[in-house]
């Protein structure tokens, strides 16, 4: 390839171009690529949203209760904008360096140590997330199934959490994770998206089925009482010590950065502007679903909202068909997120240990199988999965969402230090360090 006047350096034989236009396709339009077609814009959005939204949606109503409606709205909007901005920095660095992986950005910024650091961070974060999701499946799926089978006697195998975990891992997670391209998961990601939409719709509907003030638990809910006392008045702002514990839930609500570049690579006619539009649409739709479900969940229970939203509905509407089905839908949505997270985790392993070898289906299958076994064993045998990986996740998530994009751009960006881009990257870096330190401190305090 001929070096242009705007090339900035070369590393390991890669030409680094700083003069590309944002609408220029990053990947060459080879005959093989033209025949495969790439992933459509819609499927790319669904995949990104599936990476964004998980079980964390159940904790946002609690976060609103602890920060107030306007406080929550401002914080969630800021987090969404910061997530979009950090994705913008990642895509801009891909344009500058002509590489398409998070690990290689670390390589260009800080050499092999940077590549290993990014790969280890991605692997730890994704293994922790997948194990936590499977732990939720093991803990909650038996109760969800039992709600459809109230007459079950004894302890049948289909109500055993470990058995269900192994079955779902072998029959659902593993086959989907073995797919050669992340774009193929667009179908399951679209299904997961509709599960989340269904969840938000049910939360809105059930606002008018539970009266305020909340009745005694032995009271049959049949009508709406006027919320004319203080406990039924929503708070616009509410910042206290408890508010701080809600911030980590919100800070990581839009974490999808390990999946952004794999989705980018498979996008049909990939360019920075097109992938940025994918990210903007995905984040905007996720914000909308987050906000609607959080708002109506809070307006249903007010200060009595649980840290896991569906617990309140299970108490006051224990036999409601919509609540039973929505719990199952959330579990299925969480389950369908696991294969999507498999892709960047497997890629991190490949980049660390097999980057100099050509692609091999046997290696692809073996690495996927080993990762699947590890996360299943962690979900089965680690008794308090969410607490263990809460500490690790708060650090790795902060790095991937805020610290690395800001730090790498400070190193790789061609602008002056006083430029808006460099200033924004520095701000993102400092903010990420503060959020990570705050989240880690709060989690340790909560465990103590």
UniProtKB/Swiss-Prot annotation:
Q: How does it sit in the membrane?
A: Multi-pass membrane protein
Gene Ontology terms describing biological process: amino acid transport; sodium ion transport
A Pfam family matched by this chain, by name?
Aa_trans
Which residues, if any, are the signal sequence? none
**Where, per UniProt, does this protein localize?**
Cell membrane
Entry keyword set: Amino-acid transport, Cell membrane, Disulfide bond, Glycoprotein, Ion transport, Membrane, Sodium, Sodium transport, Transmembrane, Transmembrane helix, Transport
* Disulphide-bridged cysteine pairs: 212-232
Please classify the protein's predominant subcellular localization into one broad category.
membrane
* Sites where a glycan is attached: 218, 228
Gene Ontology cellular component? plasma membrane
- Could you confirm whether the keyword Cytoplasm appears in this record? no
TM ranges = 40-60, 69-89, 117-137, 164-184, 185-205, 244-264, 281-301, 321-341, 365-385, 388-408, 425-445
Q: Where is this region: Disordered?
A: 1-36
* Feature: compositional bias, Polar residues: 1-12, 26-36
Q: Which domain of life is it from?
A: Eukaryota
> What protein family does this chain belong to?
Belongs to the amino acid/polyamine transporter 2 family.
Role: Probable sodium-dependent amino acid/proton antiporter, could be a neuronal transporter for glutamate.
Q: What is this protein called?
A: Probable sodium-coupled neutral amino acid transporter 6
